[in-house]
């Protein structure tokens, strides 16, 4: 079936959307008869499928192939997939009798879908549970741009691939100077890749630890710019769920860029029964006790991030294990003391972020406004 796609150049250039999942396809198919061809996972096997909008529903049909190499949906067969689609379009015969779904408009590939040959991986920058991040070169319109490319291993589970694509889908909706920009994704072959702007100074955490002591003006700037990015995400109803200095990247000019949207979601509130792989020392008490994430739990985590900035990148709750920190926060209502180098106005703001009652915590819009005013003084 892969050979069919490689030899069918017209299909490759037009309606073929690779391994783009259902959740990404859905918003592309708006009108009756809109359709794409894509790859999908069925019972552990990668197959070709047709997705079509019909009577407001998104329908999916397997592209079948007989022993002679001919392609078909139900009965009519053609030598190429392109011929099969064109036959259904021109004759107006439905894809299946039961659905009566007809093919009217093929949706051409989106500008954010990139070809693998547009990117050259150079050097590994790091790795995670499901793949690696590479310093890479992105070549388009005879321009070469340094980028970061996040990959997912071929052997990753279907669920891991869907999470990876969800991260890219969330990032595509954002455009802010303090949020990492996504250039596009590569879904036409393995490995799947997310192409992002390069932040050459690495994480804020590593910068703080490499450059002790960072001057107070830069520390305030870090906190202010992080709050700007988070205020923007708040306005987009995005709960990040993993706010920490390690997930803030720095540009060449040391601009803060909020990154790592692997745990993020666009909801008002999230219940997570398992709390797997969550960074305990950055969690709000209601997350620890009730498994709840909300914009206000992000505000709590931001308070811990600001503590990290003024503590020169030390781990929060020094000397305490995760279990000990949890017990002190929840049972004893313990709060860390802000480092003495922090301006009193910043410390007061952080202590408000750590209020037990989420409704008493400030919004990111307010936090950013107050930090920005301090930065001007």
Label each region the model flagged.
Residues 1-130, 154:
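Domain-scale recognition of modular recruitment/scaffold domains used in eukaryotic signaling
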Residues 132-154:
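Glycine-rich ATP phosphate-binding loop
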Residues 164-169:
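Regulatory alphaC helix of protein kinase catalytic domains
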Residues 222-223:
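Activation segment signature within eukaryotic-like protein kinase domains
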Residues 298:
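Conserved catalytic-loop aspartate of Hanks-type protein kinases
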């Amino acid at each position: 079936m892969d050979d069919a796609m490689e030899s069918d150049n017209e299909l490759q250039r037009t309606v073929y959307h690779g391994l783009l999942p259902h959740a990404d396809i859905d918003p592309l198919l708006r009108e009756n008869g809109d359709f794409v061809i894509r790859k999908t996972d069925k019972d552990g096997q990668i197959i070709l499928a047709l997705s079509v909008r019909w009577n407001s529903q998104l329908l999916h049909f397997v592209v079948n192939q007989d022993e002679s190499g001919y392609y078909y949906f139900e009965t009519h067969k053609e030598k190429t997939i392109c011929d099969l689609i064109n036959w259904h379009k021109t004759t107006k015969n439905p894809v299946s009798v039961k659905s009566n779904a007809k093919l009217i408009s093929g949706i051409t590939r989106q500008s954010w879908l990139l070809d693998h040959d547009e990117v050259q991986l150079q050097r590994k920058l790091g790795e995670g549970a499901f793949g690696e991040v590479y310093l890479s070169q992105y070549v388009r319109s005879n321009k070469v741009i340094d980028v970061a490319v996040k990959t997912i291993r071929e052997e990753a589970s279907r669920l891991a691939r869907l999470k990876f694509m969800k991260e890219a889908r969330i990032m595509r909706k954002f455009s802010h100077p303090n949020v990492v920009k996504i250039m596009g994704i590569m879904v036409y072959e393995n490995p799947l890749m997310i192409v992002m702007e390069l932040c050459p100074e690495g994480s804020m955490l590593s910068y703080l630890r490499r450059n002790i002591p960072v001057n107070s003006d830069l520390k305030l700037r870090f906190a202010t710019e992080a709050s700007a990015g988070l205020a923007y995400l708040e306005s987009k109803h995005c709960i990040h769920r993993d706010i920490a200095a390690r997930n803030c990247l720095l540009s060449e000019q040391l601009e803060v860029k909020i990154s790592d949207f692997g745990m993020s979601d666009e909801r008002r509130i999230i219940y997570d029964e398992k709390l797997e792989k969550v960074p305990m020392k950055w969690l709000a008490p209601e997350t620890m006790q009730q498994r709840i994430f909300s914009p206000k739990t992000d505000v709590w985590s931001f308070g811990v991030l600001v503590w990290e900035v003024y503590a020169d990148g030390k781990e929060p709750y020094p000397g305490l294990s995760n279990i000990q920190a949890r017990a002190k926060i929840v049972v004893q209502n313990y709060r860390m003391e802000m480092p003495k180098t922090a301006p009193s106005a910043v410390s007061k703001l952080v202590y408000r972020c750590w209020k037990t009652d989420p409704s008493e915590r400030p919004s990111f819009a307010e936090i950013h406004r107050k930090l920005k005013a301090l930065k001007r003084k």
